[in-house]
Amino acid sequence: MSSTILGTIGQTPLISLARLNRPEEAQVLFKYERYNPGGSIKDRAALYLVETAEQRGWLKPGGTLIESSSGNFGISLAMIGAAKGYRVLILVDPKTTEANLALIQGFGAEVIVVTEQDDSGSYHKTRIALANKLAREIEGAYRPDQCFNRLNQEAHYRSTAREILEQCPGELSAFVAAVSTGGQLGGISRFLKTYAPQAQICGVDAVGSTIFGGQANAYRTPGVGLSWTPLNLTLSNLDYAYKISDEHAFVAARAFARHEGILMGPSSGACALVALKLAQQWGPERRIVSMVSDGGDRYIGTLFNDEWMRSQGFSTTASLEDVREIARELKPWSESPGECANEQMGLTETLDVPQATLLANAELHVHDMIRARRSPAAAFLD
């Protein structure tokens, strides 16, 4: 029995695919994060950040959680705030879906809609800057700061990555995940490079995002993308970087719902395409884990709305053969992601990143140096 809903975070299932996997190809497995109580992988990092802040004294009873998020992380914090008795203030933007707004507010959180775009045409920097300003002005406020706080990736290093290896006995040949704030991909890739060095790590982004460099353009796929390479992600830990078009990401997610009975968001559809690409190249002795970060129920008004899909010029048909053909034609954006960094120096100063974030990052840097001097077996038990 769990004493609170928060005790049910983690230990999500690893699912094989009944119809997509073929005996002559590598096996694709989905790490299905929809089973977290807040409905996404973001529950893990949100809880870790909040509980670390409580332990450090950065967040005290009756305090306020303030975060910039257009979706899952805001929902997770709203749930955690309700369970722990904190006021929660989430900064969103006009692209935030009605479903996500309803979930955030359903947990009792307050919402501020930021309408000013930043220098890249998105809302990330303006949302973050305002969240940091409010955190300074509101007494007892704490900013989890998923974009710049390296505790985000540490949460996945300590939980998600370990679960994957425990649930996947034998060889793990590849791991595929989407990238935005870099927490899940950053933490899991760092762990796997030590404890499953044979695994190829693939990062997946949207066409139009510049995390892996390239030309910035508008994109529709939620849950991916930034206009810079996030601090949480070390690109040299990746073996491949892929950029997937909006239409392909949406069509793939619809196909898995209709033909495998697995609901997922578009960013997870993009990851599944990359996993399938690898499976087609390899034989049956190989195993690929692809992250499904949330469920598709958050995208009923877009992903599963034929009228909306047609308004975007997207196909509404989604057969498994279509998906297999899309995957077959994919090519990596880069086979040397470490050379693709789009680092924007001075962002921490420009956006006035909170002192608690800087302290957490400094402490984690020291801990990483100590961890690096220990044997892998000893460090694994840390």
Labelled PLM ranges:
Residues 1-382:
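PLP-dependent amino-acid enzyme catalytic core
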